[in-house]
UniProtKB/Swiss-Prot annotation:
Signal peptide: 1-18
Disulphide linkage map: 48-90, 79-125, 83-127
GO BP, sorted A to Z: angiogenesis; branching involved in ureteric bud morphogenesis; cell differentiation; gene expression; glycogen metabolic process; placenta development; positive regulation of cell division; positive regulation of cell population proliferation
Alphabetized PROSITE patterns for the sequence: PDGF_1, PDGF_2
Region described as Disordered: 136-158
Biased composition regions of type Basic residues, renumbered to the chain: 137-149
Function: Growth factor active in angiogenesis and endothelial cell growth, stimulating their proliferation and migration. It binds to the receptor FLT1/VEGFR-1. Also promotes cell tumor growth.
GO cellular component: extracellular region; extracellular space; membrane
Entries under CDD domains matching the protein: PDGF (cd00135)
Protein name: Placenta growth factor
């Protein structure tokens, strides 16, 4: 008898949740006015530009893998977005360095300390043609993709 009551309660809760979620889904449809985001706003939000992105510190400083950082990721501006043509991609044309205070924890968990770490941020972005590279060219550049963290650069990064 108790099992039957519990089962009935369970079904009532499920039915209540289903009705509530159905109401939430149809609430927007009952309105006579549908909110539509204008094309210019959609285009502006999605077009190639610097956008904030969480970046893991160890992705930027792979040689520091033996340490723990807090926070483990930082918010940086990076070029992202659409270019409106499949032959183009969004790349940085101007970058700047930003230095942040990060908590660094040694592998043996000895006293941790604050360090200043420099990261590259994208300031200006542009849609540029995608360069087709041959396999031989890719092999030559392999391992040379990381740039120096302490120098400012005006060059686009891959």
């Amino acid at each position: 008898m108790l099992v039957m009551k519990l089962f009935t309660c369970f079904l009532q809760v499920l039915a209540g949740l289903a009705v509530h979620s159905q109401g939430a889904l149809s609430a927007g449809n009952n309105s006579t006015e549908v909110e539509v985001v204008p094309f210019n706003e959609v285009w502006g939000r999605s077009y190639c530009r610097p956008m904030e992105k969480l970046v893991y510190i160890l992705d930027e400083y792979p040689d520091e893998v033996s340490h723990i950082f807090s926070p483990s990721c930082v918010l940086l501006s990076r070029c992202s977005g659409c270019c409106g043509d499949e032959g183009l991609h969004c790349v940085p044309i101007k970058t700047a360095n930003i230095t942040m205070q990060i908590l660094k924890i040694p592998p043996n968990r000895d006293p941790h300390f604050y360090v200043e770490m420099t990261f590259s941020q994208d300031v200006l972005c542009e849609c540029r043609p995608i360069l087709e590279t041959t396999k031989a060219e890719r092999r030559k550049t392999k391992g040379k993709r990381k740039r120096s963290r302490n120098s400012q650069t005006e060059e686009p990064h891959p």
